[in-house]
From Swiss-Prot:
GO terms for cellular component: cytoplasm. A motif ('KMSKS' region) lies at residues 261-265. The gene is gltX. This is Glutamate--tRNA ligase. NCBIfam families: gltX_bact. It comes from Chlorobium luteolum (strain DSM 273 / BCRC 81028 / 2530). ATP binds at residue 264.
Length: 504
């Protein structure tokens, strides 16, 4: 698999047509992991030869998203390198030179067919049950066609628009060994005379890609299986130029749970969408890595760091079958990372979010305290099992930072009885007088208060939770009260008792 004596070089070559697709991220990730595993180089090349589809700012967004994901290239349009330019639109003269070489060698020819003629020919072939391909009307006589060379020269002299096509040899088979799929063979009868240079002077993807892959000395091309049908054209171009092709690995499709091809119709496909929802870089990379690759039978590990992925990744362990994209798996991975992420790292994320919330809200809590490391660390340790995203430490735990203004109506109806205010009033001095306001002390005091009365702890636990947080769910009540602190808890109890009325 490794080309002996050559430094491994892989590439991710997106077109700047929009946001990075999750399928594109997987292709980039596998190229990155393989290159780093082999102590090689990972390169980004931008394939912008289709000017009609180019989107302003897309190139910058692609590179920014890849760097967010930790896939920092060794060479790119931004990072430079010895094999540039890394934008195909800046390499047009180079492609033109290689195209002239093929014209001189008799492996390419001028084609003056109009789009109307091509469409008419396509429709006719489809009616006949044939696979649509160019009918070679403009293939010169001296290349096995029927068009006199003089006709092409006449059209060229007149300034008529043209494309340049490759001449696919007749009656040959094109064969290669795919690292993932094994040997694959194509019959040249099924291969179209691919356009190499378009009428606007820009090369097609197929031509520019082969030229650049050779000149940039890539050893391995790792890409999606949608490119498999293009392989014979690419391999023939290598043959025309007398170049050794790189090794190829074609990755399986990404599928929706219903096994249809992953598409925006069934959910988000842009990496940017997942970033905005709050998924972490670690969880996304871990999830994407497992969409097609596994470490092997008997291995039950599912949570991997980037370092572990680099160490254990291999193209031989990438499957051929389509990989199911299940959001539940991504959510599960995110929770695993939150459970184990150092509090200090979570604080870096949530403190700016909290400051933003505080700027638009009033709070009775000490702002310096609730944005301080000690307080935030306590909230994180109490809530990390209950949140799915880092931002939920602020949104789902808002009662740690803001006084409740409302109290969950259904919970009040269910848990607040005519006896509740009297019990709370009687218990309040006990809370005020605790020598230490700790979870253990609060729990012991509450039990010591209710047991002599023949009551269960729940008669106070539920009302206290509603008063302290405004909601009926959350972490351990005793730990929550300890984190909030005596002053805030007593104030909330008194405020709530004034505002909550006994249900009729």
């Amino acid at each position: 698999m490794h080309m002996v004596g050559k430094r491994v070089r892989t590439r991710f070559a997106p077109s700047p047509t929009g946001y990075l697709h999750v399928g594109g991220l997987r292709t980039a990730l596998y190229n990155y992991l393989f290159a780093k595993k082999m102590n090689g180089d990972f390169i980004i090349r931008i394939e912008d030869t289709d000017q009609s589809r180019k989107v302003e700012g897309a190139q910058q967004n692609l590179i920014k998203t890849l760097e967010w994901a930790g896939l920092v290239p060794d060479e790119s349009p931004v990072h430079g390198g010895n094999f540039g330019p890394y934008l195909q639109s800046e390499r047009l003269e180079l492609y033109a030179g290689y195209c002239r070489q093929l014209l001189e060698d008799g492996t390419a020819y001028y084609c003056f067919a109009t789009s109307e003629e091509l469409e008419e020919n396509r429709q006719l072939q489809m009616k006949q049950g044939l696979q649509p391909k160019y009918n070679r009307k403009w293939l010169p006589e001296d290349m096995g066609g029927s068009m006199p060379r003089s006709e092409s020269e006449k059209m060229l002299a007149s300034g008529a628009p043209y494309v340049i096509r490759m001449k696919v040899p007749d009656y040959v088979s094109v064969w290669f060994e795919d690292i993932i799929r094994g040997p694959i063979e194509f019959d040249s009868a099924t291969i179209d005379d691919q356009v190499l240079m378009k009428s606007d002077g820009f090369p097609t993807y197929h031509f520019a890609s082969v030229i650049d892959d050779h000149l940039m000395e890539f050893t391995h091309i790792i890409r999606g299986e949608e490119w498999l049908p293009s392989m014979p054209k690419h391999l023939l171009l290598y043959e025309f130029f007398g170049w050794e092709p790189p090794k190829y690995a074609h990755l399986p499709l990404l599928l929706n749970p219903d096994r249809s091809k992953l598409s925006k119709r069934q959910g988000d496909v842009a990496v940017e969408d997942y970033i905005q929802k709050g998924y972490s870089q670690e969880a996304i990379i871990n999830f994407i890595a497992l969409l097609g690759w596994n470490e092997g039978e008997g291995c039950e590990q599912e949570v991997y760091s980037m370092e572990q992925l680099i160490d254990r990744f291999s193209l031989e362990r990438v499957g051929k079958a389509g990989s199911i994209f299940t959001i539940d798996k991504l959510n599960w991975l995110e929770k695993q990372y939150i459970k184990n992420r150092p509090a200090e790292k979570i604080i870096e994320t949530i403190r700016p979010l909290l400051q933003e919330e505080l700027s638009s809200k009033e709070t009775m809590l000490d702002r310096e305290v609730i944005t301080g490391d000690d307080y935030l660390r306590q909230v994180i340790e109490l809530m990390r099992e209950r949140v799915g995203f880092e931002h939920e430490f602020v949104t789902f735990s808002s009662y740690f930072f803001f006084e409740p203004e409302t109290w969950e109506e259904e919970a009040v109806k269910k848990r607040w009885t005519s006896d509740t205010p009297a019990l709370l009033s009687e218990f309040l001095p006990t809370l005020e007088g605790l020598p230490e306001f700790t979870s253990d002390a609060i729990e012991a005091a509450l039990k010591a208060f209710v047991e002599p009365k023949g009551l269960k702890a729940a008669v106070l636990i539920h009302p206290l939770r509603i008063l302290a947080s405004g909601v009926s769910f959350g972490p351990s009540l005793y730990h929550m009260l300890e984190v909030l602190g005596r002053e805030a808890v007593l104030r909330r109890i008194r405020k709530g008792m004034e505002c909550i009325t006994v249900p009729a």
